[in-house]
Amino acid sequence: MIVLLEDECHLVWGDVCGMVWGKRNTPIVVPMTNERERQTYYGALNLLTQEFHLYEASAGNGVNTVAYIRWCQTLYPDKPLVFLWDGASYHRGEEMQKFLAETNDGVAGADWKVTGMRFAPNAPEQNPTEDVWLKGKTHLRKQFAVNKTFAQVKRCFSTFLHALQFTSTKLSWYWPTEQMI
């Protein structure tokens, strides 16, 4: 069984802006060609290996969620997948219900190929994947002078996340630790 801590991130052109040093009482101008440019990413952190699986999508919705899960299935063929995720409507919507019914058809619950479990409502601090997104956006802010186009911002973000060696004490919340009795 593979446990994946999943979340979506919406990267916008404004995410590259942060704090910079400048002369006092002098505004710093950062040109933005289109503040509405946006890229949605699906990401899941493997609980055991801490490997991060990044996937570009046009939006966060049921169709793209199912596509992401199918893509994750290709990464772990013949392994049951458990997704821990937030309460986004498309995680439990019509497309997901149909996908789960087809994928797990006629199989007992313990043997399902794909299972989705929700974190507590309104508790993003429970999901270590939120910390991955924060690290990626923090990296972007440090690279603001280098990334002149939104395509460069997207490339910088995904390259950083693909190379990231992520560790977090939050992962131990979901993984049993050995204790002497």
Locations of regions flagged by a protein language model:
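Short, basic/hydrophobic alpha-helical segments
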Residues: 64-82
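A generic "structured core" feature
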Residues: 4-6, 72, 83-84, 158-161
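Acidic/histidine-rich, metal-coordinating catalytic segments
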Residues: 7, 79-92, 119-122, 127
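A short acidic, often aromatic-flanked loop/helix-cap motif at beta-alpha or helix-coil junctions
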Residues: 11, 62, 122-128, 150-151
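Extended, low-complexity cationic-aromatic segments
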Residues: 1-70
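C-terminal anion-handling pockets and recognition modules
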Residues: 1-3, 115, 126-181
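RNase H-like polynucleotidyl transferase catalytic core
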Residues: 27-35, 103-128, 145
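A short acidic (Asp/Glu
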Residues: 14-16, 93-97
